[in-house]
């Protein structure tokens, strides 16, 4: 039976030093992967392109925070309570499986957004058994996906391996706002490892327990989600799969996807606002720039029942793969002020910016203070969070709060998914006049989150080419791990010496090159092609006469002669491709 493309790529990746199974000599563990020498170079080149786009061109700044995160942070963010997947255990062999994925393996049904009860009913209805031993499956339950650890000796303080890099940015919001002089909008990048204790990872490099994220948290005024550079992308045509069309049973899968300009998608309300649309356009451009097939990219909107607990809108950049179908590689979410408001409530530290007005003005506003004699006894340890919530209300939110409490005698507030009923006698409200120069604003956050490992695999698959006499990776020169192979035609005269000098010259000029004198020249070309080297430089007899070399281009196999003195400039120009 012929191997599918995934098997071919993984075979090449293992032989040539792109990807290896982790802990291989001990039998390996699913959900972990090692990057070999070429894999590291490729992955780092992708990350460099990411930094080029977002840090250099967009003017964002990067920070780095710890991967170990205290319980309090992830309780406030909602991950302790909400970062879960459905799990089912075999009653016989005790093997665990992710329930929704297991059902989809046996039944042609979409399990996205199904409740635990609905998943349980599907298992019973279709008599789905344990795929390992055929035993009966137990009840579907929630499983928290975070790796738990302890901070310090004695296990007194619980910590987790971070499930996303974003929380490190939110925690430092006060410092970041100060760095950006309290001017909105501003963008912050973090690139690093995140962790997800997958129940039964069976998709190789697609579903990892430890993975690299490149995330942007873009802080905006909650009432100003236009983007100043929107005109630069408004004509970009993108393939969109809106939630409404996904749910339309009268449309085929192909008909559900629409190709539309970014500008028109915003005008028609398909994309919620300009800032999400802007990042969708940038994501498309980035993926195409590194070499992802433009015909295998689409942007799918999350359905209401699959939206993350912190988001009001989210679009995934999905990339098509032969074995796994469409896989999510980038998520672009409007997280509103959920994170900053939650951390403010839990920590008691105000996380807002002061937005100056064009000119001073006198306003009527409300001072809302808690009646501690009453609420302290009722809410106890939650009193601090409630006070922080009220203190962070904007002028508009204060008006709404007072209006509701006057009309209904109470207000229901929600802090991290927990509801509190605030009665009229719990607060003291005063109407006052004051002159203001601006207002406190809790910014909303637009978050593009890139899964670098999935993107790396997709790039390998989309670059894989087979011809009658060779296999090669059609990697763009700017992305390819090794830029040039330097080859003496034969191992005699001064050819090896000159070839080694050229290799050193290229490396000193920032071009990663590799010397190879092993085997016939044709075999060496094939070896270079298979790992995606865009240029082979051959030192031959003519080199000894006129100091020129042949430069062979990987895809076309065409060769040109270039003077050694001009080789660096020639390659640097070609490596921009």
From Swiss-Prot:
Binding residue positions for substrate: 98, 164, 211-215, 447-451
UniProt GO molecular function: ATP binding; glycine-tRNA ligase activity; protein dimerization activity
Keyword ATP-binding: yes
Gene Ontology biological process terms, A to Z: glycyl-tRNA aminoacylation
Keywords, in A-Z order: Aminoacyl-tRNA synthetase, ATP-binding, Cytoplasm, Ligase, Nucleotide-binding, Protein biosynthesis
Alphabetized Gene3D superfamilies for the sequence: 3.30.40.230, 3.30.720.200, Anticodon-binding domain, Bira Bifunctional Protein, Domain 2
CDD domains: GlyRS-like_core, GlyRS_anticodon
EC top class, as a word: ligase
Location in or out of the cell: Cytoplasm
InterPro entries xref list: aa-tRNA-synt_IIb, aa-tRNA-synth_II, aa-tRNA-synth_II/BPL/LPL, Anticodon-bd, Anticodon-bd_dom_sf, Gly-tRNA_synthase/POLG2, Gly_tRNA_ligase_arc, GlyRS-like_core
PROSITE patterns given in the database record: AA_TRNA_LIGASE_II
Enzyme Commission number, as recorded: 6.1.1.14
Keyword ATP-binding carried by entry: yes
Protein residues bound to ATP: 196-198, 206-211, 328-329, 451-454
Its job: Catalyzes the attachment of glycine to tRNA(Gly).
Protein name: Glycine--tRNA ligase
Protein source organism: Methanocaldococcus jannaschii (strain ATCC 43067 / DSM 2661 / JAL-1 / JCM 10045 / NBRC 100440)
